[in-house]
């Protein structure tokens, strides 16, 4: 089973929605809110759909609302892949 990595997620974000020129996605962006990275809800819906298709998981309709940072989306995806619940440090912290 292949888990989603930050590098994988950033590639998917770029492919699904492009990259904001003023944002350096090469830096430490795991805990930066998607909106601060220049990605709106439509971009995230496209990315979540691609994750669901590529990784064979169902993240649910509220994935975009709950996963406000790359770390939270990665944890949510990998928890779904492994059958575990997302860690308290990810999605819960981002609320």
From Swiss-Prot:
One Pfam family cited in the UniProt record for this chain:
PP-binding
Residues bearing O-(pantetheine 4'-phosphoryl)serine are 41
- Please verify whether the record's keywords include Signal: no
Q: Which residues form the Carrier domain?
A: 3-81
- Pathway where this protein functions: Antibiotic biosynthesis; oxytetracycline biosynthesis
**What InterPro entries does this protein map onto?**
ACP-like_sf, PP-bd_ACP, Ppantetheine_attach_site
Q: Which SUPFAM superfamilies match?
A: ACP-like
Entry keyword Zinc-finger:
no
What PTMs does it carry? 4'-phosphopantetheine is transferred from CoA to a specific serine of the apo-ACP-like protein.
UniProt entry keywords in alphabetical sequence: Antibiotic biosynthesis, Phosphopantetheine, Phosphoprotein
Matching PROSITE patterns: CARRIER (PS50075), PHOSPHOPANTETHEINE (PS00012)
Signal peptide positions are none
What is the role of this chain?
Acyl carrier protein.
User: Any idea what this protein is called?
Assistant: Oxytetracycline polyketide synthase acyl carrier protein
Q: Which domain of life is it from?
A: Bacteria
Biological process, per Gene Ontology: antibiotic biosynthetic process
